[in-house]
Regions:
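Acidic, proline/glycine-rich low-complexity intrinsically disordered segments
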Residues: 18-171, 176, 198, 210-211
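TPR alpha-solenoid repeat register
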Residues: 71, 136, 170, 214, ...
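Conserved small/polar residues in nucleotide/adenosyl-binding loops
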Residues: 370-371
């Protein structure tokens, strides 16, 4: 029997681990209870940067329910063709799911279209229609943060925490207002509070102390302050907690940053090499090699940097890149070569690398338009 059902996590079934407060979650539509279990595990993996595991769980969910809209939407394939196909399929099935899911899809599509007014409109509707769910406030807080409406975002995210003291995403966004975290929008410098950021990081560790990412996040605070020795044990804890996971590579990567900025380039490169060895995807392999390249540039060793780029280039064909991605990587490599040659006063080689990079870039654009 494959009757469609909606799972709404009502207060009687879900409680905050912190204070036993009943927690209401947004409804998710699927034809399979087991698929929903996999989906929830996938979202927990995404929460802490385990993209590979997230996609594995979503593969399992989609094997049970091919039309699982939110699983299709949240999959995030690294294959651009598969990514587009899954997003288009999710969009085509949008009318088959709950109003809450439609609003979430609208928000994500608005981001892709660069229409932040539409994103805000839908996020506000989500809160209006599902004001008893902590997740709706996370969605709105994210949009408000990205619109630089930070005072509103802080109030919204604190409301999420009122409804669920274990709202990991809310604490993560609040911390990111004070501590640099990727591309997250931060408060103006005069309003940032390092101590408050550390307090939020401790909440992340309390909620997800089973995983290394919160330790990594807190270590970043000390690294950014130049307190490299204070950051080291937290990075080591992050590595320990991520053993066997795809994000173990990330743990070694950020630890490498700490050693590099602390002046220990030898250990930094050992950490970067370990991260590269552990990565599970072609994109991960390529991106992590970039940081090893930067370690040579950081040391003004442009010959060493060029030799490293040559090694990456030789290995590219053996990696499982699709054609468009491979051309893009080749274009990037030649741009990197150009920078290194230019810094080393090798003008002819720099121009040659620039020309080759342009050729690969044009080929990628042509191929992408066909695909």
């Amino acid at each position: 029997m494959n009757k469609l059902f909606n799972i709404v996590f009502i207060a009687a079934l879900t409680f905050s681990a912190c204070s036993k407060i009943p927690v209401v979650e947004l409804p998710i539509t699927t034809s399979s209870p087991k698929a929903l279990e996999f989906y929830k595990k996938a979202m927990l993996s995404e929460q802490v940067g385990d993209g590979f595991e997230k996609r594995q769980y979503l593969d399992s969910a989609l094997a049970l329910d091919l039309n699982f809209v939110m699983a299709l939407e949240m999959y995030g394939s690294q294959d651009p063709i598969k990514l587009r196909e899954q997003r288009e399929m999710a969009k085509s099935l949008q009318n088959t799911v709950t109003d809450a899911e439609q609003l979430m899809l609208n928000i994500r599509n608005a981001y892709r279209d660069g229409n932040m007014d539409h994103a805000l409109e839908n996020a506000k509707k989500l809160v209006e229609n599902y004001s008893d769910t902590y997740e709706s406030y996370v969605w709105l807080g994210q949009v408000q943060s990205d619109r630089y409406e930070l005072d509103d975002a802080i109030k919204t995210l604190k409301k999420s925490i009122e409804l669920n003291p274990d709202s990991y995403e809310a604490y993560s966004l609040l911390m990111g207002h004070h501590i640099a975290a990727g591309t997250q929008v931060m408060l103006p410098e005069e309003k940032r509070d390092i101590e408050l950021g550390v307090k939020y990081s401790d909440e992340l560790i309390r909620i997800r102390g089973d995983h290394g990412f919160p330790y990594h996040f807190k270590a970043n605070v000390y690294r950014q302050l130049g307190e490299f020795e204070k950051a080291k044990p937290l990075y080591e804890k992050s590595i320990e907690k991520r053993k066997g996971l795809s994000s173990e590579a990330t743990a070694y990567l950020v630890s490498g940053h700490n050693f590099m900025f602390g002046g220990d380039l030898k250990t930094a490169r050992e950490r970067y090499a370990k991260a590269i060895k552990l990565t599970k995807t072609p994109n991960g392999w390529f991106n992590l090699n970039y940081y090893l390249l930067v370690s040579y540039m950081f040391d003004n060793d442009y010959i060493g940097a060029i030799e490293h780029i040559d090694k990456i280039e030789q290995a590219l064909e053996s990696k499982d890149f699709d054609e468009v991605s491979l051309l893009g990587r080749k274009a990037t490599i030649h741009w990197q070569k150009m920078v290194c040659y230019a810094h080393n006063q090798m003008e002819e080689d720099a121009y040659s690398a620039l020309e080759q990079g342009s050729i690969f870039g044009e080929k990628r654009a042509d191929r992408k338009s066909v695909v």
